[in-house]
Amino acid sequence: QDLIYKGDASAWLKTAYGLKARYTMRLINRSTDKQADLNKVLDYVSKSFTSADDEAAYAVYDANNINPFFGYFDSRAGFANSQSLTDKLIERKDPRLERVMLSPTTADKKRVQVTGSADKNLVPAPNGTPEQNMQKYGVSAFVYSNTAPTMLMSYHELKFLQAEALCRLNRTSDAEKALKEAVAAGIAN
């Protein structure tokens, strides 16, 4: 039973090329011909996903069958957005601050999406040894959805791999374009 692609062999072939890109890049420092292997990464990426619609997402969760990552993070008190991460996102005007940061609100223990660096709900955990209370500090939206799919391979990961390969090949303008596409795809996801 194929719970990801429902038996679509061409979709699995695209996923296989994406995984080849991932693991070729993962082993790049052991390569005897880095330039050739970086070009292989680019070739594999070109044969893989063309949009987020293609990505390998295990999307079978519901109220009775929660995402295991959510279960893991929700059952532990020590996960929160750190002060240092939050400061870096603010300093760099990183759009992920508004997209992925959730902060606690009132006693109802619901979360709200942060609207920016001036948002009074932006409550990062202090660096060091903060109180272990996930309800007190902000968390990533990606760990706060019990029905979010588990990604085997995402489109934005491929775009990041493409950007890294291009950068290592000193094709900086192409790398910058791929990086911007990767960030946009990741935020949209």
Regions found by a protein language model. Name each.
Residues 1-161, 165-188:
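Structured, solvent-exposed acidic/aromatic patches
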